């Protein structure tokens, strides 16, 4: 339900308005009936502007907003500015991404430096796979229920619960002297990772203005890659320190404590407060998020959220959950959104990124590098830099475009790596990696270069786009839908973590990376035919696009139209008249 704004009174001449629209200049709209405090902004990206019949004394412009059930920037005086409060909420939530990345980064270094500290013996390949996969298993379990838990207990409480899981898991690992205690610690930490990996993007998407929702969600991915980079850096520094791996694990408690402390003083999202009937808190959060917005329109937004909340079927929590699951699978647009969300998360895992990161240390050793933790910084650093590139491009270039750039690039890099592995002659004997034949020394350099190329294309596309999953689903199935998608990611991670070393032994590194190249090629085809362009679209428009198909051409045309509208008119400033306020 959008706001109906009948007319905005202009003191600008008709010709000047026309020139402004054509030249993308701002047009000032003022009212003699209202105060400057109610000044707002509106962009043509989410509105159609129609010229109404002009009176003798003034021009009148009719603005017809596009309905959007969850777009704060449309409902709240069309204000696209980013407040310090929203920035604070985004960065605090994104600490979950940092902890996620740190967890995936430190285990690679820890497995190398553990030595005989567990059970007084060296870990076997099977034990390493179990320790690595335990976190993925824990994350898979909690991600299935995290979406529903977020609706029951709140996004904030779920994030704080994930902090407690991190603390328990880290303490068990730091104090571990047996393999099974280490594995249990990793499992419990995985519970926290699974909750945080789902709730943090959901939290950010619910407090972010639409025009920069993509960028703010990418901040979580940026912190994830930053966590990996920090973990590799710390691992390199502690590689030769006695019990350095315990210190490495213990350092994960620092961001956990920071996030938990900050969340104690910050609110939940407005949508959650509305779900619980606490309209006063919802109004308070919206006021702090959009400080230049009139109280009338904030109250209108709260009323709309109340209406949307009442539209969720079911009289109690179990019935609502069951009906939501049915609606997710039976409504065509929801089912297509689910296919896209789960498909992208599966692609992220089954194109070999985690596998390549795990093996990068051994690859670099074959060309003369001895500290595998240190050289892994090159790959994780590339991942971080190109995630930053995605941050600046995802809302401008578009989600679909960067995916169709990234996936073919990944396929090419994997093919080259497979060929290079074949000529380099690396094979596994079941216990350690052995260079059977070095072949041409240049093949090692080729592998290094294309591992970096792979990391760049991964970070640009499939490393970031799947976490935009919240925008695929309407409000009443978003929690369950994002749970499905995130669980798919962790199921894939579990499969890869528990089988990668076995694949290297059975089908050789060359065959393993050729397998990933084939999956990457199929993934490109999937995205080309099934993933529409969603950048700049209203949430209502996303559901319309997916109603009777994936409608790739229609989505591209609509996204192009939105960009043209923004190019024609940057913004319209206005002050609502009392007539408008009463009508709202």
From Swiss-Prot:
Record topological domains on the Cytoplasmic side: 1-81, 151-163, 208-215, 268-349, 398-400, 463-486, 532-584
Catalytic reaction annotation: myo-inositol(out) + H(+)(out) = myo-inositol(in) + H(+)(in)
Annotated transmembrane regions: 82-102, 130-150, 164-184, 187-207, 216-236, 247-267, 350-370, 377-397, 401-421, 442-462, 487-507, 511-531
Basic and acidic residues biased stretches: 30-42
Molecular-function GO terms, alphabetical: myo-inositol transmembrane transporter activity; myo-inositol:proton symporter activity
Keyword Transport among UniProt keywords: yes
Extracellular topological domain: 103-129, 185-186, 237-246, 371-376, 422-441, 508-510
Highest taxon of source: Eukaryota
SUPFAM superfamilies per record: MFS general substrate transporter
Glycosylation sites: 371
Membrane topology designation: Multi-pass membrane protein
Family under the similarity heading: Belongs to the major facilitator superfamily. Sugar transporter (TC 2.A.1.1) family.
Protein name: Myo-inositol transporter 1
Primary gene name: ITR1
